[in-house]
Amino acid sequence: MGDSIRIVKTTSENPDFLSLIKTFDVYLWDRYPELKTNYWGNNIIELNRNVVVIYLDEKPVACGCFKKYDKNTIEIKRMFVAPEARGLGLAQRILQELEQWSLELGYSISILETLYKQQEAISLYQKVGYEIVDNYEPYVGLENSICMRKQIVRIDL
């Protein structure tokens, strides 16, 4: 792979986003089949206008989106980097893009949920300023969930 990176703001109807999400779901359920029953409904993305897809040499390799949680808060959803593109800092780029986009829309707080078994994801989120908090709805009572929160600040991308 070369190093041509293109970041696209799009919607959940984008075919490349949908393809990445299908790959992500297969990855999750292959890795954690025991969790599928409790978590499937929380990962369905309805029409969403706040989606980012990253292309590496014109191939879609990473994605993420956010949705409104409350008047000040967005929830980061469906963060995924394809295995062949990991280690290139793309997950951080997605988070930065989503956070800055949410600031432009007037939000100041970002929350997210990940599985406690996703230690690499937890480490990434902590590295970029997220802190573990009590589980928020709809994750209250789900022992496998780790919820995190961050005050968003403007950065120059």
Predicted segments, located by residue:
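Residues that form or flank phosphate/diphosphate-binding pockets in enzymes
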Residues: D16, G89, E120
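C-terminal "cap" of GNAT-fold acetyltransferases
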Residues: E13, S108-S110, L115-V128, D134-L157
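Acetyl-CoA-dependent GNAT
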Residues: G2-K77, A82-P83, L95-E97, N135-P138, ...
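Conserved acetyl-CoA-binding loop-helix of GNAT-fold acetyltransferases
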Residues: V81, G87-Q100, K127
